[in-house]
Amino acid sequence: MIILGIETSCDETAAAVVRDGRFVLSNIIRSQVDLHQRYGGVVPELASRRHVTSIVPVLDLALEQAGIGPSAIDAIAVTEGPGLAGSLLVGINVAKTLAFVWEKPLIPVNHLEGHIYANWLTLPGQDEVPEPTFPLVCLIVSGGHTELVLMRGHGDYVLLGRTLDDAAGEAFDKAARLLGLGFPGGPAIQKAAEQGRPGRFSLPRAWLGESYDFSFSGLKTALLRVLEQYQRRPARRVAAGQPFPEYVAPEYGPSVPIADLAAEFQAAVVEVLAEKTARAAREFGATMVLLAGGVAANAALRQRLREISPVPVRYPPPILCTDNAAMIAGAAYYLAQRGVRADLDLDVHAHLPLVTRTLLRAGEA
């Protein structure tokens, strides 16, 4: 089964062709980082406008690289949520149009489920990735979400924990802004941390008792308090005659230990994520831990989980950690096996949860 996937939930315009939920025939991503860097984060209005101008060329290239035309496609898959409403709307409208004109089934996909299914994908030229065996503990870590999920089968998810405030990726973005490292924050923090010494400063870890929930807002505030000792001028936004104010980074004195603070901040985030995930894998008898989402590309998180997990750890290659359409097409294959379809009145669901049911004890599994 060949599925064309479309992903426009935030600031990447993406289209991909995937065979049988596993094999990537093409995976085209057009990033908007250059557009949003000057603002210190994603501007939703600008993101949706860029999707409008990018989506058709991206689709054309995805089909061209896959070497197929519309007649070879069995279904159209699209992200229905969660994400930015204006961005999601572009992808959904295009997907509905193609489904109507080409007379193909339309499959709606949860963006978070797509991130999980990136772990099933094999890129062109790679050895085939074996299918994971259930049950799995999945750590979904991105700019907008941090969730720990028990996956007992295709479509069978139970929520173990989630962030109570900032997502891990959001925490990295905010910390990078405080440190003057730019956007996106995750790669910037990781690069700076490579030159730093974690432990020179002591930033808090929010363990929240035996809970599998997460909290990163206190960590961000603690970093701010340390930086205030070195600050010459706070961060600010300057309109400069533009419709959206530009972000101007803070200024610090020459002695500010940016690399050490980045290393300690990263260590604090990674330690909590990894420890709770490894504990969940033990408690619920997982056969494997899956990392998913943009923060899954973080080398320190990957390494720490490999060190302490009681079971093997799998994570996608970096190109499949970021938002992409191959993961949407991959997830759609397994949805199609369960008969999931959408009508042409499919709408945006900006706050769509992956799962609402919470597992409180291992015995409930």
Curated annotation (Swiss-Prot):
<dbReference type="InterPro" id="IPR022450">
    <property type="entry name" value="TsaD"/>
</dbReference>
<keyword id="KW-0819">tRNA processing</keyword>
<comment type="function">
    <text>Required for the formation of a threonylcarbamoyl group on adenosine at position 37 (t(6)A37) in tRNAs that read codons beginning with adenine. Is involved in the transfer of the threonylcarbamoyl moiety of threonylcarbamoyl-AMP (TC-AMP) to the N6 group of A37, together with TsaE and TsaB. TsaD likely plays a direct catalytic role in this reaction.</text>
</comment>
<feature type="binding site">
    <location>
        <position position="186"/>
    </location>
    <ligand>
        <name>substrate</name>
    </ligand>
</feature>
<keyword id="KW-0808">Transferase</keyword>
<feature type="binding site">
    <location>
        <position position="115"/>
    </location>
    <ligand>
        <name>Fe cation</name>
    </ligand>
</feature>
<keyword id="KW-0012">Acyltransferase</keyword>
<feature type="binding site">
    <location>
        <begin position="140"/>
        <end position="144"/>
    </location>
    <ligand>
        <name>substrate</name>
    </ligand>
</feature>
<dbReference type="InterPro" id="IPR000905">
    <property type="entry name" value="Gcp-like_dom"/>
</dbReference>
<protein>
    <recommendedName>
        <fullName>tRNA N6-adenosine threonylcarbamoyltransferase</fullName>
        <ecNumber>2.3.1.234</ecNumber>
    </recommendedName>
</protein>
<dbReference type="GO" id="GO:0061711">
    <property type="term" value="F:N(6)-L-threonylcarbamoyladenine synthase activity"/>
</dbReference>
<dbReference type="GO" id="GO:0002949">
    <property type="term" value="P:tRNA threonylcarbamoyladenosine modification"/>
</dbReference>
<feature type="binding site">
    <location>
        <position position="323"/>
    </location>
    <ligand>
        <name>Fe cation</name>
    </ligand>
</feature>
<dbReference type="InterPro" id="IPR043129">
    <property type="entry name" value="ATPase_NBD"/>
</dbReference>
<dbReference type="GO" id="GO:0005506">
    <property type="term" value="F:iron ion binding"/>
</dbReference>
<keyword id="KW-0408">Iron</keyword>
<feature type="binding site">
    <location>
        <position position="111"/>
    </location>
    <ligand>
        <name>Fe cation</name>
    </ligand>
</feature>
<keyword id="KW-0479">Metal-binding</keyword>
<keyword id="KW-0963">Cytoplasm</keyword>
<feature type="binding site">
    <location>
        <position position="173"/>
    </location>
    <ligand>
        <name>substrate</name>
    </ligand>
</feature>
<comment type="similarity">
    <text>Belongs to the KAE1 / TsaD family.</text>
</comment>
<dbReference type="GO" id="GO:0005737">
    <property type="term" value="C:cytoplasm"/>
</dbReference>
<feature type="binding site">
    <location>
        <position position="298"/>
    </location>
    <ligand>
        <name>substrate</name>
    </ligand>
</feature>
<dbReference type="Pfam" id="PF00814">
    <property type="entry name" value="TsaD"/>
</dbReference>
<dbReference type="InterPro" id="IPR017861">
    <property type="entry name" value="KAE1/TsaD"/>
</dbReference>
